[in-house]
Amino acid sequence: AIGPVADLH
């Protein structure tokens, strides 16, 4: 994804 938090899943 674009946001770092979105990729933490």
UniProtKB/Swiss-Prot annotation:
Signal peptide (from-to): none
GO MF annotations in UniProt: hydroquinone:oxygen oxidoreductase activity; metal ion binding
Thermal dependence: Optimum temperature is 60 degrees Celsius.
Tree of life domain: Eukaryota
Keyword Transmembrane in record: no
Catalytic activity: 4 hydroquinone + O2 = 4 benzosemiquinone + 2 H2O
GO biological process terms held by the UniProt record: lignin catabolic process
Membership in a protein family: Belongs to the multicopper oxidase family.
Misc. comment: On the 2D-gel the determined pI of this protein is: 4.27, its MW is: 54.49 kDa.
This protein's name: Laccase-1b
Annotated source species: Cerrena unicolor (Canker rot fungus)
Lineage of the species this protein comes from: Eukaryota, Fungi, Dikarya, Basidiomycota, Agaricomycotina
